[in-house]
């Protein structure tokens, strides 16, 4: 089971932590884990390379935990509102995509020990 916890401050998403293994298939062959990893790196690269924002990320393969946070989503740290909206929009879009997948989880054959869940933690940066 993978848990994706989104970090939010004053209603603005600024990061997330992914932990665990979806267990839809064997480690290394799981399309859901591959999707989560791909979207995660897309978000990191977009913040750094496209929007010129500040992003920190940590990948702990031993514990299967990935943490991504960006101050550029928050008005206290980023003056350019276009960057703020773009960065926070990436996090919000990821959240909504996962939320939508959970609404249609009958399309996937998860066992009781596999799948994913999403949470939101209101936490200052």
Residue ranges and their predicted role:
Residues 1-30, 45-125:
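N-terminal intrinsically disordered, cationic/polar leader segments
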Residues 32-36:
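Short, conserved glycine- and acidic-residue-centered signature motifs
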């Amino acid at each position: 089971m993978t848990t994706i916890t989104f970090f939010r401050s004053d209603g603005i998403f600024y990061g997330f932590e992914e932990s665990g293994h979806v267990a839809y298939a064997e480690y290394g062959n799981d399309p859901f884990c591959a999707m989560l990893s791909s979207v995660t790196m897309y978000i990191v690269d977009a913040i750094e390379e496209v929007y010129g924002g500040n992003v920190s990320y940590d990948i702990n393969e031993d514990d299967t935990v990935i943490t991504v946070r960006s101050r550029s989503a928050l008005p206290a740290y980023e003056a350019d509102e276009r960057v703020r909206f773009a960065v926070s929009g990436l996090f919000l879009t990821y959240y909504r995509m996962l939320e939508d997948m959970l609404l249609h989880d009958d399309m996937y054959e998860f066992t009781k020990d596999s799948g994913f869940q999403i949470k939101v933690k209101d936490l200052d940066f």
